[in-house]
C-alpha cells in the first residue's frame, strides 16, 4: 500500500535510486496504490550522468510492496521493499533493464514490457 510521501526504491537502470510518491493516480481522492498501479513520483536520489535527474517528476508503476498482494487461491506475496519502475508519457519503461522479481499482476495491467525485461516473475 503506497500512499503520498512514501519512499520507494527504483527497480530499473534509469539512473534514479530512490523516488517519493507525490500522487496516486486513478481517482480524485484515491489514497493507496498497490502492485500494478501508476503513481506520480519525484526523484530524490540519482546517480551522476543518468537519464533522470534529482527533482524530476515522472510517472512510475509499483512493482513490489511490503504490504503484499492476495491471489485468488488465497496465497499472499510480500516483498522486502517497496519498488517502482519509472515510465515515460506513453506508459512504457524508460529503462532497458529491470532488477529483482516482479509479479504476474503486472500482466493484467498491460505492462508486458516490464515482465519481459524482469529476471523473475512470481
From Swiss-Prot:
The name this protein goes by in its record: Large ribosomal subunit protein uL14
A GO-annotated cellular component: cytosolic large ribosomal subunit
InterPro entries reported for this sequence: Ribosomal_uL14, Ribosomal_uL14_bac-type, Ribosomal_uL14_CS, Ribosomal_uL14_sf
Source lineage: Bacteria, Pseudomonadati, Pseudomonadota, Gammaproteobacteria, Moraxellales
Highest taxon in the source lineage: Bacteria
Family statement: Belongs to the universal ribosomal protein uL14 family.
Any single GO BP term: translation
Provenance organism: Acinetobacter baumannii (strain SDF)
PANTHER family named among the record's database cross-references: 50S/60S RIBOSOMAL PROTEIN L14/L23, LARGE RIBOSOMAL SUBUNIT PROTEIN UL14M
Keywords: Ribonucleoprotein, Ribosomal protein, RNA-binding, rRNA-binding
Function per UniProt: Binds to 23S rRNA. Forms part of two intersubunit bridges in the 70S ribosome.
HAMAP family, per database record: Ribosomal_uL14
GO molecular function, one term: structural constituent of ribosome
Entry keyword Flavoprotein: no
Known partners and oligomeric status: Part of the 50S ribosomal subunit. Forms a cluster with proteins L3 and L19. In the 70S ribosome, L14 and L19 interact and together make contacts with the 16S rRNA in bridges B5 and B8.
Amino acid at each position: 500500500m503506497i500512499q503520498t510521501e512514501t519512499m520507494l526504491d527504483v527497480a530499473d537502470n534509469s539512473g534514479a535510486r530512490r523516488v517519493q510518491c507525490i500522487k496516486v493516480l486513478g481517482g480524485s481522492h484515491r489514497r493507496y496504490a498497490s502492485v500494478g498501479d501508476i503513481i506520480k513520483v519525484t526523484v530524490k536520489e540519482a546517480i551522476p550522468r543518468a537519464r533522470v535527474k534529482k527533482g524530476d517528476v515522472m510517472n512510475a508503476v509499483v512493482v513490489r510492496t511490503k504490504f503484499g498482494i492476495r491471489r485468488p487461491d488465497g496465497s499472499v506475496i510480500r516483498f522486502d521493499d517497496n519498488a517502482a519502475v519509472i515510465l515515460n508519457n506513453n506508459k512504457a519503461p524508460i529503462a532497458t533493464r529491470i532488477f529483482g522479481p516482479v509479479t504476474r499482476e503486472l500482466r493484467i495491467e498491460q505492462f508486458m514490457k516490464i515482465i519481459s525485461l524482469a529476471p523473475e516473475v512470481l
